Curated annotation (Swiss-Prot):
HAMAP family: Homoser_kinase (MF_00384). Gene3D superfamilies: 3.30.230.10, GHMP kinase, C-terminal domain. Belongs to the GHMP kinase family. Homoserine kinase subfamily. Keywords: Amino-acid biosynthesis, ATP-binding, Cytoplasm, Kinase, Nucleotide-binding, Threonine biosynthesis, Transferase. This is Homoserine kinase. GO terms for biological process: threonine biosynthetic process.
Length: 286
């Protein structure tokens, strides 16, 4: 059995802690034979290979008496870069328990569990459903809507350094004035409505008008302003911080993606530029 979970790009500007899209980088878990103890074969560096791994600890939160197995974990989702690496593992852990214990969890069940573990739905929801997901988590209740993302390319600049979510959250203010909250909410409303309507020009304008988090976090990602300015010269719809950063994501017409990638590479920044697409499948079991 093989479990595959996509990477995710959350927030998308003003959709803070609420909006995310699944993209074409993947975590794969291959389930091998039963064993006396859990063992995960991987080449992902200094992460546990036993039940202390987030994958297994998540699965055991769902079903505490699972039969241990040998597993193989592979992933091309970079760690601590704002592409949902931990969320993909949480979703995979829930699916692992679902399959091994035949729990018959619905996607909504999985989202409820994942959100309680993660604390917000913006990454775990698209990892489960695929596509674009808008979700809320209030009073321990998750409400979500899934739709297709308008046709475009995602040009991701992934810096060589990590940025922990806790550090990125530390840059945020403790509150907003009522006036700013109303303005920020109206911008988010337009961004979501435009994405649902397929109008990437208006969506892009609203995405770049975010008032919730990007203005505070940009100083932690020194490449952001340079890439945003350059992307505008190539007709991009919007540039935003993916999740908590440091990945800088640009939405661009498909026919401009390669040219923009080449231009970003030409800046000589310390990192990698990739062209990604929307993943429409979410978590998949083969």
């Amino acid at each position: 059995m093989k479990i595959t979970v996509p990477a995710t790009s959350a927030n998308i500007g003003p959709g803070f802690d609420s909006v995310g899209v699944a993209v074409s980088k993947y975590l794969t878990i291959e389930v091998l034979e039963p064993a006396d103890v859990w063992f995960i074969e991987h080449d992902l560096g200094d992460i546990p290979s036993d039940e202390n791994n987030l994958l297994i600890s998540t699965a055991l939160q769902v079903k505490s008496d699972l039969q241990p197995h040998k597993l193989v974990m592979t992933s091309d989702i970079p760690l601590a870069r704002g592409l949902g690496s931990s969320s993909s593992v949480i979703v995979a852990g829930i699916e692992l328990a679902n399959q091994l214990a035949d729990l018959k969890l619905s996607d909504d069940d999985k989202l409820d569990i994942a959100t309680k573990i993660e604390g917000h739905p913006d990454n775990v929801a698209p990892a489960i459903f695929g596509n674009l997901v808008v979700a809320s988590y209030v009073d321990e209740h998750v409400n979500s809507i899934v739709t297709e993302f308008p046709e475009c390319a995602f040009v991701a600049f992934i810096p060589s350094y990590e940025l922990k979510t806790s550090e990125s959250r530390g840059a945020l203010p403790s509150d907003l004035s009522y006036k700013d909250a109303v303005a920020a909410s109206s911008i988010a409303n337009v961004a979501i409505a435009a994405l649902f309507a397929g109008d990437l020009v208006k969506a892009g304008r609203a995405i770049q008008g975010d008032m919730f988090h990007e203005r505070y976090r940009q100083k932690l990602v020194k490449e952001f302003a340079t890439i945003k300015e350059l992307s505008g010269q190539y007709g991009a719809y919007a540039t935003y911080l993916s999740g908590a950063g440091p990945t800088v994501m640009t939405l661009t017409p498909n026919d401009q993606a390669e040219a923009l990638k080449t231009a970003i590479d030409g800046l000589g920044l310390d990192g990698e530029t990739l062209i990604l697409s929307v993943d429409k499948g979410g978590v998949v079991v083969d």
